[in-house]
């Protein structure tokens, strides 16, 4: 089978998807590694829809023919009916900023619940609205992050004045009901990769899941997200988030040094 490497500098080819026979898509947050299957939290979706499969095939063709992350993700996120559900396939970097704004608006419109799993939260639209929601204290908001990865972000922001303005927002968000998995910090020489790796947002009955962290870098990487309007699935995945966060202690912001 032909294969092609996509340069990951400066932005990552971060997709994890398969299209089978132009009819079915397998996608989500899980890399194809032993640790991903056995040591990490991940979410995977299977969508049986030729129109959705066509969107992913178009995105694959962008990567295959250009070999350049920055020239991809330009497939429009037009809605598709899959049974009685409305589904959108989002791709970045072409629609990266639009995706962050879309998720932020869904959170802002939520009236019953918001559940989040994301290793980090750094995308400005999402960070801003979450800080507002936590401050208002009226919405059932909870989630889980990867504590060492968020601590790494905090350390970087403290060293870089250009993004230090985000620190009060992140600190405010993490005073909410967020757990932090104490994973093994990433090391260049390898080791255990047991990160909290799921990328999932539930806002009332709307679900966003895929390869995209809620991050500024994610807006620029080659990523994909499924947006699904499905009350039953939203209930299932909100319960999944609650299960994940119940396994770990609350996030601790004040233990960051540097």
Segments (PLM) and residue ranges:
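PLD/PLD-like phosphodiesterase catalytic module centered on the HKD motif
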Residues: 1-26, 30, 34-41, 46-65, ...
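Proline-centered turn/helix-capping motifs that create local helix->coil transitions or kinks
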Residues: 64-72
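Long, charged amphipathic helices and adjacent flexible linkers at domain junctions
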Residues: 71-80
């Amino acid at each position: 089978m032909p294969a092609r490497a996509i340069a990951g500098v400066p932005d990552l080819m971060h997709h994890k998807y398969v299209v089978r026979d132009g009819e079915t898509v397998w996608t989500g947050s899980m890399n194809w590694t032993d640790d991903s299957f056995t040591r990490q939290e991940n979410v995977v979706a299977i969508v049986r829809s030729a129109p959705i499969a066509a969107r992913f095939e178009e995105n694959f063709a962008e990567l295959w023919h250009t070999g350049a992350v920055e020239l991809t993700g330009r497939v429009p996120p037009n809605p598709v009916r899959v049974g009685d559900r409305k589904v959108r396939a989002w791709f970045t970097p072409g629609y990266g900023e639009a995706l962050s704004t879309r998720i932020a608006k869904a959170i802002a419109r939520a009236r019953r619940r918001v559940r989040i799993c994301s290793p980090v939260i750094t995308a400005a639209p999402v960070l801003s609205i979450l800080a507002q929601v936590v401050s208002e204290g009226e919405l059932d908001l909870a989630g889980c992050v990867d504590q060492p990865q968020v601590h790494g972000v905090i350390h970087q922001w403290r060293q870089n004045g250009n993004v230090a303005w985000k620190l009060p927002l992140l600190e405010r968000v993490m005073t909410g009901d967020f757990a932090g998995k104490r994973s093994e910090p990433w090391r260049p020489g390898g080791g255990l990769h047991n990160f909290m790796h799921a990328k999932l947002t539930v806002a009332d009955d709307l679900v966003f899941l895929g390869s995209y962290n809620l991050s500024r870098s994610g807006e620029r990487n080659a990523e994909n997200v499924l947006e699904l309007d499905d009350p039953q699935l939203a209930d299932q995945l909100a319960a999944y988030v609650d299960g994940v966060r119940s396994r770990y202690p609350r996030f601790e912001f004040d233990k960051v040094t540097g």
